[in-house]
């Protein structure tokens, strides 16, 4: 049996894969948080609930409408994004000129309301969501079997993350979004509808959370608690990467997922706290985060 640092290669590669899977969800969710905070200056505590909404929307589309996984992967983010747009336009937009604490408290209350509603109707136990037939099975890599769906999760999340990064950082629309945050009056003078841009930004963040939820549905059971169990870790990832940093959210999400996975191999007792230990160290040495800009 091949060993690496005294660990069987199958066990090492298996945990590396688990780390990449978790990192894919960390990256997608952190990216949504970074987009919302970086462009709206809102700490969106409802992000975990929107992730859960994505998974439940996919499940309900399947059970009530017979909508398959591939269509749900498109429809669920659009539905949750529309829900986010309504929330932003009708309620959240009224808090922009107030202290950040008000936005945090509002989104925290919204998360509790959404989670409580789903717990009332569906209970706290998880419900299965089957992966599509085309993504079932595994590929023999020689040293391990790679579940096809797990590989799809990593690839899909990477494509979406890079696509959003390109949209925000390299396109004219992204330039308008960034400028609208810094100087909305100037952007409006060019005939740009700034309130609409802000609404679309929040919808994008909510849609990213929902997309992650649909990807997660076949990996984990669909549960009202799935978002609240993950959101604290995701906030830690965002802090390490730098609040509002798009690239930082993506890179740090994957990196910390891998670190967490490898920690389960070499020091399992620390696997549940390693991300928070890294966050504490980063806050001490570089408070703005690894990719954040110093104030």
Model regions and ranges:
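Helix-loop-helix "hairpin" substructures at the membrane interface of multi-pass membrane proteins
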Residues: 22, 144-222, 246-252
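Alpha-helical transmembrane segments within multi-pass membrane transporters and channels
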Residues: 66-110, 117, 251-256, 286-287
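Transmembrane alpha-helical segments in multi-pass inner-membrane proteins
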Residues: 26, 66-78, 199-214, 218-279, ...
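Membrane-interfacial amphipathic/re-entrant helices at transmembrane-helix boundaries
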Residues: 1-28, 57, 69-72, 98-102, ...
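Cytosolic-side transmembrane-helix boundaries in multi-pass membrane proteins
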Residues: 2, 11, 90, 121, ...
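Hydrophobic core segments of alpha-helical transmembrane domains in multi-pass membrane transport
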Residues: 55-59, 77-83, 110-118, 156-165, ...
């Amino acid at each position: 049996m091949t060993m690496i640092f005294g660990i069987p290669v199958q066990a090492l590669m298996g945990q590396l894969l688990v780390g990449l899977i978790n990192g894919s969800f960390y990256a997608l969710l952190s990216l949504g948080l970074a987009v919302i905070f970086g462009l709206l200056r809102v700490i969106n505590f409802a992000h975990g609930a929107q992730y859960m909404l994505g998974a439940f929307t996919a499940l309900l589309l399947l059970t009530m409408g017979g909508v398959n996984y591939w269509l749900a992967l498109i429809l669920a983010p659009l539905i949750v994004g529309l829900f986010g747009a309504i929330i932003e336009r009708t309620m959240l937009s009224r808090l922009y000129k107030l202290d950040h604490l008000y936005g945090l408290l509002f989104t925290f209350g919204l998360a509790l309301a959404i989670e409580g509603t789903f717990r009332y109707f569906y209970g706290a136990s998880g419900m299965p969501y089957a992966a599509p037939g085309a993504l079932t099975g595994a590929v023999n890599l020689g040293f391990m079997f790679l579940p096809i769906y797990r590989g799809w999760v990593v690839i899909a999340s990477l494509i979406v993350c890079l696509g959003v990064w390109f949209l925000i950082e390299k396109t004219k629309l992204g330039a308008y979004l960034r400028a609208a945050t810094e100087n909305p009056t100037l952007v409006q003078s060019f005939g740009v509808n700034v309130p609409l841009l802000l609404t679309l930004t929040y919808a994008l963040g909510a849609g990213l959370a929902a997309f992650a939820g649909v990807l997660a549905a076949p990996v984990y059971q669909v549960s009202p608690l799935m978002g609240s169990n993950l959101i604290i870790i995701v906030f830690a990832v965002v802090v390490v990467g730098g609040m509002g940093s798009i690239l930082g959210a993506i890179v740090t999400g994957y990196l910390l997922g891998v670190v967490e996975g490898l920690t389960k191999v070499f020091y399992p007792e620390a696997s549940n706290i390693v991300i928070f230990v890294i966050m504490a160290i980063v806050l001490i040495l570089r408070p703005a985060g690894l990719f954040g800009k110093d104030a």
